[in-house]
Amino acid sequence: MRRIVAGLGALAVIAPALLAPVAAFAGPTCTTEAKDKWMSQDAMKAKVAEMGYQKIKTFKVSGSCYEIYGYTKDNKKAEVYFNPVTGAVVKSEID
């Protein structure tokens, strides 16, 4: 019986360490507003184009964000998260 208890104790120590990397891959929190307050996807796509992003390969809802994969006006790869209410950039990764 001791081995089972010791095994469960070890699991309690290891489990949080295994789950921590999952949180690292989660996207940012862009808004807490309800979706009926969000800009339409068409309006956001227009704003993204006005900001100079082009060749958008992916435009999607990601958690509480609009997320794009495309290119900057300087032709650099971009992954960008936007606040869907204001259109502001919340997080960007430019290569």
Regions found by a protein language model. Name each.
Residues 48, 68-69, 87:
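Conserved histidines in hydrophobic membrane contexts and catalytic metal-binding motifs
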Residues 78-90:
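A short, surface-exposed beta-strand/turn
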Residues 1-25:
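Classic N-terminal secretory signal peptides
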Residues 32-55:
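Short, non-transmembrane alpha-helical segments in secretory-pathway proteins
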Residues 73-75:
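Glycine-centered tight beta-turn/hairpin loop motif at sheet-sheet or coil-to-beta transitions
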